[in-house]
Structure formats: structure tokens, C-alpha cells
Amino acid sequence: MIAPADPARTESTLIKAITTDLAFRAAEHLTVLRGGDGYRPGSLGFGGMADCHPFRIFEGPNDVLFDQVARDYVGSSEESTLGGLLTEQGMPTVDGPLRELMDRPICTESQRVMVAIGRMIGIVSLWRWALDSPDTFEPDELALVRDVCEEELAGECARLLHRQHSGTRSG
């Protein structure tokens, strides 16, 4: 029998995976914006992508982690909606369109959907960690964390809805 994962370790790994993905995406955007110069080894964007890459190599693909976490959390939860599951994981209250996007039943038949749910759990973990560290962040930094996390959650919800409405079941 396999012992359950340490929740603190799982959360720290999720936060590391989410922040690595965000940093890689930001570096990739900067690289593209710089055009041909962005791909030179000395450029800031290219250096940022290179700095993020080792985590992906040594820790394995983030998608595998997100899928496993989602299956663990969905399997142990009694919540039937995505918003309920994320609230159970400590998501602060959200309103408006984001709340409407999350008021959907949890669909577990697709690996891609489970990866998205795991990623959302990681975003909530990052958000909760920032809120639980008020002495570490200034109020404007906490507001930025909230904005980024809400934007990331909305993007994941939109991708989930698109997959469900387009009938995409690959994964």
C-alpha cells in the first residue's frame, strides 16, 4: 500500500509548478516580443526560459503532477462543482463572471480536463499561500496576486468550457 502524499509537500510542489509555468510563459512572451534578438543566449527572455527549464526536466512534466493532484482531490471531495472543489481547497470568494464559470459540474472523463483542474488547484494554493503570508507582501502585491490568480482561473475555466462544448475528449 502506498502512503498518501504529504499535503504540505504536495502544495509546495504545486506552487513551484505554477510559478515555473508563469515565469516560463512570461519569459517566452518577452523573447517573442524582442524578435530575433530575443532568441540570443544573452537576452533576458531567453535566459528566463533557460532558468525555468531544469525544473521541468528533473521534476517531470507538470501535466502529470496536475493530473495526479486533481484525481486525488476530486476523488476525496464531496463537492460536485468546480467552484465548490476550489473553495474547499481554500479559494477566496470570487464573484461575477468567474463565479459563473466555476458553477459547473466536475467532469472527470478527460485527462486534459483533469490537468486543468489540477492546475486550478495549484493556482488556488499559490493564492492562499500569498494571502497567508501578509508580512511578506505589500497590499499592492497581494492585489496583483489576486488579479493574476483570477485571470489564470478564468482562462482555465474558459478552456474547460471550450473543450466541453466542442466535444474534445482527447487525453
Segments and roles (model prediction):
Residues M1-G171:
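Flavin-dependent oxidoreductase catalytic core characteristic
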